[in-house]
Design a protein with these regions (language model features):
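Extended alpha-helical scaffold segments
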Residues: 1-153
């Protein structure tokens, strides 16, 4: 039982390290998103789309890391050898890691929502630019018609 407990402690330490690594990676993605919202005002639509794609790749990488940590915690949770005493010990050892992992799921969802909003901003900006171009094109066409004395038909 003691050997099994020591093994569980080692797996719990590894799980904590992997949770911390995933937490740092997710924090960097969140910081990247904070920078994006500031860049949205001054960036062109094509730059915004490129930034969104770059951020999407970072989010997917962080999500894969979180999923890997979840699998690591699941394997560590299963290392109790069928003993109820060890099972309770495993649950206690991994409780904080599981709680942090659940918070990470909501953080990933929040970052994905922020990215979705950023993309919507890019689409609105594109629509506004197209509206300005349409108005300018209509003005040019009417000026040309007036200069050449053409009718609307």
């Amino acid at each position: 039982v003691k050997a099994l407990r020591d093994e569980v402690k080692e797996k719990a330490k590894e799980a904590v390290k992997s949770v911390e690594g995933a937490d740092k990676e997710l924090a960097s993605v969140e910081n990247h998103m904070k920078g994006l919202t500031g860049k949205a005002k001054g960036a062109s639509v094509s730059e915004m789309h490129a930034l969104a794609e770059e951020t999407d790749a970072l989010i997917e990488k962080a999500k894969a890391t979180v999923d890997g940590v979840r699998a690591n915690l699941a394997s560590a949770s299963g290392a109790h050898g069928g003993l109820d005493e060890i099972k309770a010990f495993v649950t206690a050892e991994l409780k904080t890691s599981n709680v942090r992992l659940e918070r990470m799921n909501s953080r990933v969802a929040r970052v994905q929502t922020l990215l979705k909003n950023f993309r919507e901003q890019a689409e609105k900006k594109l629509a506004a630019e197209l509206q300005v171009l349409r108005a300018a094109a209509r003005t040019r066409m009417r000026q040309h018609q007036a200069a050449k004395e053409l009718s609307l038909e």
